[in-house]
């Protein structure tokens, strides 16, 4: 039932407050609501925030100038855990009085006509003084005396109650009437790495180099540890391994996904399980569990986290297929059903049937996950979570977080929006997205605005490629396209990722029209000579390193919620800015989407979006090239694909008094959703 005052559209809230919104430690979190009442009396509101441990505190909410029913506040959570907040709204008699006497004074009313207003003002300030501390109490009582002094000019008696000092005191110790409390909403706050992270994917088995005859040698955890030095130097935070478990022998796939393997074929890591073990074992050729623990330790020394693949499926010779046939679907002929996506068949993989023995499956998967957590793994990339029950994932993530809230789960869910965002709502920290297929200016703009608007729900990890996805733009766009896509991914989201080989411009598909790599690393060893490519100038590694450095140096690129697109008079150029409300750091990015031709145009800078005023001039510094320019509202840019595909301009810091408003949640006109 509605209260005395209306409190509507409280944000953030997810699925009717049945699930918590998302945030991380140190993130600027906007809170907003519609607060209203009848008549002309002013209303005010606070956000009442309760940390996981500690006392509740209040934040005064600001009203929009031209839409005063919209109220806003921001806060920065400083600890992990479940935060709660509610909106308290009330009738604000002091603001009502200030508005009334200001209008009457401007209308030229006399002291006699304002007598009742002065009397009411004295009463209000005396009431306010009673609840203020001593120093502020004296200020408020002094104002009451001035208002009551009929020997003073009218404007002096009115204006004494309108100063900024008075407003600050009354914001801190407001007079509140008809207090109405809104619903309690929840925000799940994770560690910062759930939002700010650069991922690099590599296959440990491909790190062994070649033998004397030029044949690939199976990598080990030891050779993988050596490869981590290069990954760390590029500035990545997380190194992700596809499954490191034993690979099935039965129905093993051959090179390029051929149905029959020949002697020496290593198979797909996603066909998990053999006589050597299942999801809790390591592939014998990679090493031992102790070797893996040493690898995790080495990664941490380099400032890297290791992410493991959690692929809940089994090869026909997985121990589960032998000991837990109830985990699968058994056909009429007594065989276990293999995976199918008609007309495709995957004879090397058995999908799990979660409804046959849910308790057994749930407990076994939890045991497997905690096995790796206890070995030092704090991040999991989950393979195809949208093909498993959503209540299972909610149960598993909640259960793991009971003891290990630091564990991050990335959903590899290339699926319909309801599934993708539904999985995010129930607990996945990050999600793959359709960024790979967003190539035009219009599509990129719509995509970026969508994901920033859904920051309470989902955190997009923008991978430029994966072992499964070599987009046509990379196949045909030349080397410049690799730089273009990297620049977009690294600056549009605080989460981005690269699959090994991207820096070598690997671009050949298995056949025309396919997004699969030729000689896919999913089915064979693919050692790479990164150093020779770097020495010969045939590597994107320096540019990727520079992008990660720029990201680390600029907090504006470490947040998801604030992105603003600027008009630029060329469909092949895209321009957008980001601002960090804590530091005031501001960045403006311009990218040439044409990988074969130079593009130029005039950019019309929306000055308010970067904390400036129209007509201002300001200095911009290109973090990529080092060049500096003096800019204004309208500026010329030109980008050449073989020289610089993007400008990443560092702008003047936004002054403190303009920062918070830039972090407010955008509420479109007439958006009155429940």
Predicted regions and their residues:
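Active-site neighborhood of glycoside hydrolase catalytic domains
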Residues: 322, 326, 330, 353-423
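Hydrophobic faces of well-ordered beta-strands that scaffold small-molecule active sites
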Residues: 198-200, 239-241, 306-308, 380, ...
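Aromatic- and acidic-residue-enriched carbohydrate-binding clefts of CAZyme catalytic domains
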Residues: 193-219, 247-295, 322-359, 518-527
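Catalytic-core region of carbohydrate-active enzymes that cleave or remodel glycosidic bonds
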Residues: 397-412, 417, 439-514, 582
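Carbohydrate-interacting/catalytic domains
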Residues: 1-205, 209, 213-237, 299, ...
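Carboxylate/His-rich catalytic cores and anion/metal-binding grooves
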Residues: 232-256, 310-329
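Substrate-binding cleft/loops of secretory-pathway carbohydrate-active enzymes
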Residues: 315-326, 393, 402, 414-442, ...
């Amino acid at each position: 039932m509605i209260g005395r005052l209306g409190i509507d559209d409280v944000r953030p809230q997810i699925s009717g407050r049945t699930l918590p919104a998302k945030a991380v430690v140190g993130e600027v979190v906007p809170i907003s609501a519609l607060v209203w009442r009848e008549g002309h009396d002013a209303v005010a509101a606070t956000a009442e925030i309760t940390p996981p441990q500690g006392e509740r505190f209040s934040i005064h909410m600001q009203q929009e100038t031209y839409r005063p029913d919209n109220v806003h506040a921001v806060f920065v959570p400083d600890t992990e855990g479940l935060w709660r907040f509610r909106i308290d709204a009330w009738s604000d008699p002091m603001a009502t009085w200030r508005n009334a006497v200001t209008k009457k004074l401007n209308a030229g009313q006399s002291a006699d006509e304002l007598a009742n207003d002065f009397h009411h003002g004295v009463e209000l300030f005396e009431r306010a003084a009673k609840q203020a501390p001593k120093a502020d109490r004296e200020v408020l009582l002094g104002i009451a005396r001035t208002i009551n002094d009929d020997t003073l000019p009218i404007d002096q008696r009115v204006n004494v109650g309108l100063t900024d000092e008075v407003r600050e005191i009354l914001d801190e110790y407001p007079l509140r009437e008809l207090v109405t409390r809104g619903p309690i909403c929840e925000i799940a706050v994770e560690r910062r790495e759930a939002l700010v992270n650069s991922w690099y994917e590599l296959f440990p088995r491909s790190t062994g180099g070649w033998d004397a005859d030029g044949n690939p040698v199976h990598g080990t955890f030891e050779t993988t540890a050596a490869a981590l030095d290069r990954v760390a130097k590029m500035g990545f935070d997380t190194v992700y391994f596809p499954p490191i478990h034993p690979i099935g022998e039965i129905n093993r796939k051959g090179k390029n996904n051929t149905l029959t393997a020949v002697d020496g074929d290593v198979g797909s890591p996603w066909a998990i399980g053999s006589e050597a073990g299942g999801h809790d074992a390591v592939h014998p050729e990679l090493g031992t569990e102790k070797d893996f623990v040493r690898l995790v330790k080495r990664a941490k020394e380099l400032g890297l986290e290791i992410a493991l693949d959690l692929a809940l499926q089994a090869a026909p010779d997985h121990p589960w297929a032998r000991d837990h046939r109830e985990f699968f679907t058994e056909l009429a002929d007594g065989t276990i059903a293999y995976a199918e996506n008609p007309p495709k068949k995957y004879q090397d993989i058995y999908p799990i049937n979660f409804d046959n023995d849910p308790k057994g499956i749930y407990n076994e998967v939890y045991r497997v996950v905690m096995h790796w957590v206890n070995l030092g793994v704090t991040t999991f990339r989950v393979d195809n979570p949208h093909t498993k029950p959503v209540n299972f994932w909610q149960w598993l993530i909640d259960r793991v977080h009971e003891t290990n809230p630091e564990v991050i789960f990335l959903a590899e869910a290339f699926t319909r929006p309801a599934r993708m965002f539904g999985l995010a709502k129930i607990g996945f920290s990050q999600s793959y997205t359709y960024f790979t297929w967003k190539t035009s200016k219009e599509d990129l703009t719509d995509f970026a605005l969508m994901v920033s608007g859904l920051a309470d729900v989902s955190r997009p990890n923008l991978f430029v490629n994966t072992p499964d996805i070599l987009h046509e733009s990379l196949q045909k766009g030349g080397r410049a396209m690799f730089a273009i896509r990297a620049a977009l991914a690294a600056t549009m989201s605080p989460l981005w990722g690269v699959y090994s080989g991207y820096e070598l411009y690997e671009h050949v598909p298995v056949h025309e029209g396919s997004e699969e790599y030729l000689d896919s690393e999913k089915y064979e060893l693919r050692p790479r000579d990164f150093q020779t490519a770097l020495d010969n100038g045939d590597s994107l590694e320096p540019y990727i390193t520079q992008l990660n450095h720029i990201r680390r140096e600029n907090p504006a690129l470490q947040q998801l919620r604030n992105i603003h697109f600027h008009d630029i008079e060329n469909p092949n150029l895209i321009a957008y800015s980001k601002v960090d409300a804590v530091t005031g750091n501001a960045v403006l990015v311009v990218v040439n989407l044409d990988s074969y031709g130079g593009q130029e145009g005039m950019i019309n800078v929306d000055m308010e979006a970067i904390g400036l005023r129209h007509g201002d001039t300001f200095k911009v510094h290109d973090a990529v090239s080092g060049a500096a320019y003096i800019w204004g509202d309208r500026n010329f840019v030109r980008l050449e694909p073989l020289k610089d595909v993007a400008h990443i301009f560092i702008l003047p810091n936004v002054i403190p008094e303009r920062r918070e408003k830039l972090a407010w949640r955008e509420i479109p006109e007439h958006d009155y959703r429940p």
